[in-house]
């Protein structure tokens, strides 16, 4: 069989010759990784954002599948994790007969910009005491932002991390996540 990994972002990790995707290892299958358009090497110049759509992503996967189907004529499995899992679902939606099996891992399905399912879930996980300790820690780290931000910036610089948003905003997201 052939496993087509419907990556939701970049796929440079797949260039590591020792990397094996879980299903391909379990099934001793061929692997094809498809990087999501507008990420890493799959970014066109100039960037025309009107072509960054779920349907176009499914079209990409369909084109790759058609290009390789004569080389790999056996069963085909689509899989992806997180946004890649969403991509697996969308690929199946637009091209239901392209693959024999779709295995999306942790594919989030949002009901809207403000989904509303997260808050009730977060109010139930763990214990009230543990949730309070986490909240207290987050508040303390936010209160000490002026003192901690230089360390955070230094860490980001040392790791070569670059952001499209101001580093102060990234700090806040890191604390809250």
Which role does the model predict for each range below?
Residues 13-21:
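The serine-hydrolase catalytic nucleophile loop
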Residues 24-44:
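Conserved alpha/beta-hydrolase
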